[in-house]
Amino acid sequence: MQLLIPESRIVFASFFIFGLLNNILYVVILSAAIDLVGSATPKATVLLADIIPSFTIKVMAPFFVGLISYRTRIWMLVGLSSFGMLVISLTSDESINAKIVGICMASLSSGLGEVTFLQLTHFYQREYSISGFSSGTGGAGLLGSFVFMLLTNMLGMKVWVVLLLFAVLPLGFLMAFYVMLPKARGGGGDEPGYEALDSLDERSDPSSNASFSSSQTVSLKGHVVSTIKNILPLIRPYMLPLCLVYVSEYIINQGISPTLLFPLDELPHWLFSSYRDIYVVYGFMYQLGVFVSRSSISFGIRIKRLYLLSVLQFANVVITVYQSVHDKPFSSVWLLLALIFYEGLLGGFSYVNTFMSVSEEVSKSKREFSMGCVGISDTFGILLAGCINWSLEPHLCSLQVNRGRDWCLNGGSA
């Protein structure tokens, strides 16, 4: 098979699957947030459970992840994500604490997976590995939100059944890693020679001397200080603008959008049978925008002014807050859906262009480490947004209730 298909396409497809599977459960969980905790509970509850474990492991990863082989990490991803989805889907609606535990397990898998696969791109041509992974993460958002919307909004399937179906998807990691992925190329794809995948694993294996020589005993304090010094130069050019974009977009997605509601009798019943359905459709339009923009590198589109994207995304926060409070400037859900799509475009552009900039501008010797570290910033942004949304959503909802619109309290029913 590999003799008939160009290796570049196989690399792209492998990393596309990695990105797709790594992010799709995260997207589905957020799409189901209103079903998991109900209308009265801030959706930030699910967002924080879905992001704190991921953020924690991303922060800790630079200090220990190099000691765990890529093969071991793949099996960890499968176990954590599949079991987590089983817990979420099979526990009763009243067992919110148990569902939160399942969400946390899936979140750990997502965080470890992003660090792992971004580091793995270092061993392949970035035009195909980064582009494939980025497109896959965008595809996860689009596929996950669309399938969830299709099965629940349109076909009327029980939410727990839909979540149970998604529990089998992580097995695809094994196929992509062991069957599809070609042998690793040394030095980020810029050198002609290849190294076997076993050799790649040796450099991340605690029993190997490739990562730490027995003659080079480094104290824990020295290792931490050295790691922090390597992280600091990445903050201003890459991590901060990406973080700011994610703060803004997740304030919109989980804090503001549950209050951006319209009369159900003015909406098509085949798509919107309850106020809860509006939230799900917003999620799909956002993910559609993310998918389009995260795939933009494949078409040669590059945006290097990363802070511009941060400013534009914050403007969307201002617009949507105004809409929630005053029901202006949008009088139709369709115009608001277009804005949500644009919001997704900005988020996707920021993600893919940030990692492309790291790949192009950071020295080869530090590139693998840097790719893993910069991934912390988007998760930190989502974490900040979750903390803000904890009070923002209830406040916006109370303002609407005070003027006679209690739709935000009825997300699960018409």
Curated annotation (Swiss-Prot):
It is found in: Vacuole membrane. This is Protein BTN1. Its main location: membrane. GO terms for cellular component: fungal-type vacuole; vacuolar membrane. Pfam families: CLN3. Keywords: Amino-acid transport, Membrane, Signal, Transmembrane, Transmembrane helix, Transport, Vacuole. It comes from Debaryomyces hansenii (strain ATCC 36239 / CBS 767 / BCRC 21394 / JCM 1990 / NBRC 0083 / IGC 2968) (Yeast). It comes from the Eukaryota. The chain crosses the membrane at residues 48-68, 74-94, 100-120, 137-157, 159-179, 242-262, 281-301, 306-326, 332-352, 368-388. The gene is BTN1. Involved in vacuolar transport and vacuole pH homeostasis. Also required for cytokinesis. Residues 1-33 form the signal peptide. It is a multi-pass membrane protein. InterPro entries: Battenin_disease_Cln3, Battenin_disease_Cln3_subgr, MFS_trans_sf. The keyword DNA repair does not apply. Residues 195-214 are annotated as: Disordered. Belongs to the battenin family. One of its GO terms (biological process) is regulation of intracellular pH. The keyword tRNA processing does not apply.
